């Protein structure tokens, strides 16, 4: 039987990648908050 919870990089990038975040105002807020907090990785 096949495991279903592998996760795919295409889906991951498309939903929570940098360009996906920049596409919406709320996503831009997320990036801004992570910059302010000093996160090394801003997005996936």
From Swiss-Prot:
Alphabetical keyword list: Ribonucleoprotein, Ribosomal protein
Chain residue ranges for the region called Disordered: 1-26
InterPro entries in the cross-refs: Ribosomal_bL34, Ribosomal_bL34_CS
Extent of Basic residues compositional bias: 9-22
Any one of the GO BP annotations: translation
Keyword field contains Ribosomal protein: yes
GO molecular function per UniProt: structural constituent of ribosome
GO terms under cellular component: ribonucleoprotein complex; ribosome
Family per record: Belongs to the bacterial ribosomal protein bL34 family.
Protein name in the entry: Large ribosomal subunit protein bL34
Species, as recorded: Nostoc sp. (strain PCC 7120 / SAG 25.82 / UTEX 2576)
């Amino acid at each position: 039987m096949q495991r279903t919870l592998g996760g795919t990089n295409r889906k991951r990038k498309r939903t929570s990648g940098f360009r996906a975040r920049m596409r919406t105002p709320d996503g831009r807020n997320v990036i801004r908050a992570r910059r302010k907090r000093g996160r090394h990785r801003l997005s996936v």
